[in-house]
């Protein structure tokens, strides 16, 4: 799922390390892991994981790849939203495990 989703943002495929997978870019690291406490994994309540998109088109491709690989759309459809942070193009998904994700492009 995440290889297909993050590939639309030009992120290389993840590297598996024991019970984790890492996605590395020049600006950060995203990792998915089995819980180290042995308890079941659960989606964040009120949390959103965000990824930068280079353009609205890239955010749309990210959203489409997510849907094609088992995600569900949430929030409003992808599009422009204005608020205190300025004008943003946002696309929201829930991954197959229910985690809320967002691709964001800041419009100049």
Where do the model's predicted regions map?
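Core segments of cupin and vicinal oxygen chelate
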Residues: 1-30
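Vicinal oxygen chelate
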Residues: 50-97
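Active-site beta-strand termini and strand-to-loop segments that position acidic
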Residues: 23-27, 93-96, 106
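A short acidic/small-residue loop/turn micro-motif
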Residues: 82-83, 106-108
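Short, solvent-exposed beta-strand edge segments and adjacent coil->beta transition regions
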Residues: 44-48
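Conserved, structured core segments of small domains
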Residues: 31-35
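Short, charge-rich, low-complexity interaction segments located
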Residues: 38-42
């Amino acid at each position: 799922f995440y290889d297909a989703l993050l590939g639309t943002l030009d992120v290389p495929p993840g590297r598996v390390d024991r019970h984790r997978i890492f996605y590395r870019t020049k600006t950060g690291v995203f990792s998915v892991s089995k819980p180290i406490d042995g308890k079941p994994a659960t989606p964040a309540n009120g949390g959103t994981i965000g990824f930068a998109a280079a353009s609205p088109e890239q955010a749309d491709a990210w959203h489409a790849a997510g849907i094609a690989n088992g995600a569900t759309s949430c929030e409003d459809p992808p599009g422009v939203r204005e608020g205190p942070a300025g004008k943003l193009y946002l696309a929201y998904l829930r991954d197959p495990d229910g985690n809320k994700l967002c691709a964001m492009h800041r419009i100049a």
